[in-house]
Amino acid sequence: MKLRRISGLLAIALAACAPQPGVERGERPGGHPAMWRVADADTTIYLFGTFHLLPQGRDWRTPAFDRALASSDELVMEIADLGDQAGAAQAMMKLGLSPGLPPILDRVPAEKKAALQAMIAEAGVPTAVLDRMETWAAALALAGVTYRRLGLDPNAGVERTIEAPWKAGGKPVRGLETVEDQFGLFDTLPEEAQRSFLVGIVDSPADAKKQFAAMLDAWAKGDVAGIARTFDDETLASPELRAALMTRRNAKWADWLKKRLDRPGTVFVAVGAGHLAGNDSVQRMLAAEGVKAVRVQ
C-alpha cells in the first residue's frame, strides 16, 4: 500500500520533533548540499536545505556554507530550541495521550504484531505506556529504533551542529514553528493514516535503509531534482498528507521570508531539504510573489 511507504519516511522528514538516541561513529563521505540566496538592497537571506539527522563523521560543510553562516546575524530554523526536552515532553503530554485507546499491538495488522513487539522491546518503552499514546505519538516514540538501525545521530544533524556555536556567540535564533506545531501535524492525521505511519516504522529495516540512502545521497550531492523525486514518491499518493506536511507549511514560510525582506540584515535559514525542492517548494512560492531565489551552492 502506497501510504505505508509514505509513513516510513515521515519521522525522518520531521525528525526535529522526535525523540532520538545516540549511535556509533563512522566515517562518511562529504558533499555539497544546495543553498540559495534571496536579497534586496539591504537584506540578504540564505536558504539551506538540511538533514535533521546524519551519520557521525558525515562531512557536509563547505567554504561557501561557512562564509554565508559567518556573515549572518540571525539564524532561523524550523524549531528554535532543539534541546528543549521539557517543552517537547509537555507538548507530547498535551497532544499525544488520550484515554480509551485500543492496545498498541491491536493497531497493526496481525502479521506485523511480532515485529512491533520486537521493536517495543528494543526501544525499552513499556507497552502500557504506548497503549495510552495516540498512534502517531507511539510511532514517534519508536522511531528512535529506526534511527539507530540507520546509524543516525541527532547531534550530527545540520541544525544541532550549527545551533550550539551560534548561541554561544550570542546571536539570535528564531523558530518558524514550535515542537507543538510539529506534533500537531501528526495529531490532525486520520487514524488510518496514523496506523499506516506506525506500520511504516515497523516495516523492513532493509527497505528503510534503501529509502534513506537515496534521500541522503541526493541531499549530499545537491541534487534538488533527486530530492524532489524522493519526496514526490512518498507524498503524492496522499494529497492531504502532502498538503499538511509540505505545501501549507512552505506557503507560510515563504510569506514570512518575503516580509523579512522589509527589514535590513543578513539571515541564515536552515530547514529540511524537502521544503526547498519540487513544484511546491519555498522558492517556487517566493517566485510566485515576485521574489527570486538564486542558487549559490
Please provide the spans of the model-predicted regions.
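Bacterial N-terminal signal peptides that target proteins for export
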Residues: M1-S7
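C-terminal motif of bacterial Sec signal peptides marking the signal peptidase cleavage site
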Residues: L14-A16
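Structured, acidic catalytic/metal-binding patches in enzyme active sites
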Residues: Q20-E27, H32-L245
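A cross-kingdom marker for long, charged
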Residues: P239-Q297
